[in-house]
Design a protein with these regions (language model features):
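Membrane-embedded helix-loop-helix hairpins and adjacent transmembrane boundary segments
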Residues: 1-498
Length: 498
């Protein structure tokens, strides 16, 4: 056990080294926020996979495999499908825009208006809650491993994430993500999967001891599968944390191929996690909580030392998600929300900062770093004061998908969509989501039963889609000049639009 703890501790110290290394490469705001838009296929694939495969995919995926068998892979598979769709269908467009935030895309597509403003505040809430949830997840592992109090675990683990994120921004996060991607790959595929199968007696032994439902594709239930697709697949298509990784690609081709590779990796990761959970179920059926299965396997089925690598893999998955969410929150705050609060225009005429217009001064770089530190401190405070922020994250996620999805994706795929329709679809979708959630919560038998229900997001999505289509057809089309600038920039890049 001491060796396992040492391995995890060495990993944590190593993350600080990557932070310092990244600091030497971050010479401009573009370097700091999107790694200079210079990531090649290998780095891009690794960082994209690392940011989407958090604690839910790693610890949660193994737990679902323990409880439901192969169908437990659906949660992570839904994440992978989301990455695949984003990469194949939209990543080349996003890479050509050379922007920093989702709201900037809305300004480019619809022109100035309330739609981009509304999305900024939702994205900020979503990324803060995502970072706080991930921070609480790896802090819980530290509580068990090191015997620390929760607040100390949050401060130490969160302090490390905050330090390397603030030092070099996206460059530090990319380098750390690549290390985390390698640790996750080795820990899950090369160590946990074969050793767990060996301890279970192999695939044939698992088939003998487990019921047929463990080998069924829908053992988890069709309703759960649909929910995973709606929440995770659709959410990944529009999340600022994921889009910001797309913006780091060296070219539209890298964004497309590298992202698609990451999506396929995620699906394989989900299947591997489910099989590990099934192997653990073959060995013992006495693990009371499914979220404890990953740690149980690392400590009981793996040799000392190898278990430490597996635990480091779990911590790596959670830290990569937290760091990505923190820099996403700071980017939204500084790029979108501050100008709104100050009543200022956006950085450029069309609302997006182009490569040539990216601020290069030391003061601008220091400001970016300051916002990472400030919002990172907010995240640590949330993780300490509110031990369970899952309900808040669920609300933010439901608003993200139920309120914003149609306006964002509609703008990418339908030229007739208008800014007025986008704004009102956000309003109606959000009201529908929160209204349904509130009604269900008031009539729920248990606290937060309404918050965690599936119906709010369905109602929000349906209402948002109806309003978007009807108002787009009923209102004046988008200004031809705005639409033409969008067409040129989205198809040929920012240089062609100048």
């Amino acid at each position: 056990m001491t060796l396992n703890l040492t391995i995890v501790a060495v990993y944590l110290v190593g993350m600080l080294a990557f932070g310092w290394w990244g600091k030497t490469r971050a010479a401009s705001s573009e370097d700091y926020l999107v790694a200079g838009r210079r990531l090649g296929p290998m780095l891009f694939t690794g960082t994209m996979a690392a940011v989407v495969l958090g604690g839910a995919a790693t610890v949660g995926g193994v737990g679902l495999g323990y409880e439901f068998g192969l169908s437990g892979a659906w949660l992570v598979a839904a994440i992978g499908v989301g990455v695949l769709i984003l990469s194949v269908a939209f990543a080349p467009i996003l890479a050509r825009l050379k922007i920093y935030t989702v709201s900037q895309m809305l300004r480019l597509r619809y022109g100035r208006g309330g739609a981009s403003h509304a999305s900024s505040f939702v994205m900020l809430a979503y990324t803060l809650m995502l970072a706080a949830t991930s921070t609480g997840a790896y802090a819980s592992i530290f509580v068990v491993l090191f015997g620390w109090d929760r607040w100390l675990s949050v401060l130490v683990g969160g302090g490390i994430v905050l330090a390397y994120s603030a030092l070099g921004g996206m460059w530090s996060i990319t380098l750390a993500d690549m290390a985390q991607f390698l640790i996750m790959t080795i820990g899950l595929f090369a160590l946990m999967l074969p050793l767990s199968l060996a301890n279970a007696g192999g695939w044939s032994a698992m088939q003998e001891r487990l019921g047929a439902e463990f080998f069924s594709w829908d053992g988890i239930g069709v309703q759960s599968i649909v929910t995973y697709v709606v929440v995770y697949t659709l959410g990944l298509l529009i999340g600022q944390d994921v889009w910001q990784r797309v913006f780091t690609a060296r070219s539209p081709r890298v964004a497309q191929i590298g992202g698609a590779t990451a999506g396929l990796y995620c699906i394989a990761y989900g299947v591997a996690g489910a099989v590990i959970g099934m192997a653990a179920r073959t060995v013992t059926a006495d693990i009371a909580t499914k979220d404890d299965v990953f740690a149980w396997v690392a400590q009981n089925l793996l040799p000392v030392g190898i278990g430490g690598v597996a635990l480091a893999a779990a911590v790596a998955a959670m830290m990569s998600t937290a760091s990505g969410a923190i820099i996403a929150a700071s980017t939204v705050m500084r790029t979108d929300i501050l100008p709104i609060l100050r009543g200022e225009a956006a950085a450029s005429e069309d609302g997006a900062t182009t490569e040539d217009e990216a601020p290069e001064t030391a003061a601008e770089l220091a400001s970016n770093r300051g916002w990472v530190l400030l919002l990172g401190a907010v995240v640590l405070g949330l993780a300490i004061v509110v031990p369970d922020v899952v309900a808040a994250l669920t609300i933010a996620y439901d608003i993200l998908v139920g309120g914003l999805f149609v306006a964002i994706v509609g703008g990418l795929v339908w030229q007739r969509g208008t800014g007025t329709a986008a704004l009102w679809s956000m309003v109606v979708g959000t009201v529908g989501t929160l209204g349904t959630m509130g009604w269900l919560e008031l009539n729920a038998a248990e606290p937060f039963e309404g918050v965690f229900a599936n119906e709010p997001i369905y109602v929000g999505l349906a209402a948002s889609a109806v309003v978007y289509v009807l108002l787009s057809l009923m209102t004046r089309p988008t200004d031809p000049a705005v639409l033409e600038a969008w067409r040129v920039r989205s198809r040929h890049g920012v240089d062609a639009a100048v």
